[in-house]
Amino acid sequence: MKIDVTTLEAKKAGSVDLTDGVFALEPRGDILHRMVAWQLAKRQAGTHKTKGRSEIALTGKKFVKQKGSGGARHGDRKAPQFRGGGKAFGPVVRSHAFDMPKKVRALALKLALSAKAKSDNLVILDEAKLAEPRTKAAKDAFEKLGLKSVLIIDGAELDANFALAARNLPNVDVLPVQGINVYDILRREKLVLTKAAVESLEARFK
């Protein structure tokens, strides 16, 4: 699969051959859904908590005698049916993460890359570098390329000027290749890969 390479000035800079096994797979919405659910569950804080009846700071004394009152039988005021009592089956601090096989995770990433390539939302950039960290320079470059909602993946090391310039722009994310993930790919309309990122990804999936 051959695709044109462009520069930040929107000029053609040759072409690159993409591996079909990484960028030309048939779409699988079920795998992508599983992967996004896994990512979102994994990043949940899980710090929500309510107090059960054993944690409420009240006396445990039985407040009404067992028989003869004419009312229902009760133990102490910490029971869930009373105001100020403990919560029955409330949330506890826990991890929401669940297991996902490595092969499924790898497949999901390849499917996300393939989905962008198939929908013509994949752009290959010669390099993501700027002479100085100016947001206007990055904004002008993205406008020339027609990029409004975009995830930009560079090589293992980001260009500091480019990363700083793009940081203030809305709907623009810049990540090193080791940070690439399915959720961020799908949440942006366009995916931009530098040539260095393409080489790293293809080496990773060999």
UniProtKB/Swiss-Prot annotation:
The encoding gene: rplD
Name of this protein: Large ribosomal subunit protein uL4
Described function: One of the primary rRNA binding proteins, this protein initially binds near the 5'-end of the 23S rRNA. It is important during the early stages of 50S assembly. It makes multiple contacts with different domains of the 23S rRNA in the assembled 50S subunit and ribosome.
Pfam family name, one: Ribosomal_L4
GO annotation (BP), single: translation
GO molecular function, one term: structural constituent of ribosome
Keywords assigned by UniProt, alphabetized: Ribonucleoprotein, Ribosomal protein, RNA-binding, rRNA-binding
Gene Ontology CC terms, in alphabetical order: ribonucleoprotein complex; ribosome
InterPro entries: Ribosomal_uL4 (IPR002136), Ribosomal_uL4-like (IPR013005), Ribosomal_uL4_dom_sf (IPR023574)
Subunit-level organization: Part of the 50S ribosomal subunit.
Family: Belongs to the universal ribosomal protein uL4 family.
Region named Disordered: 65-85
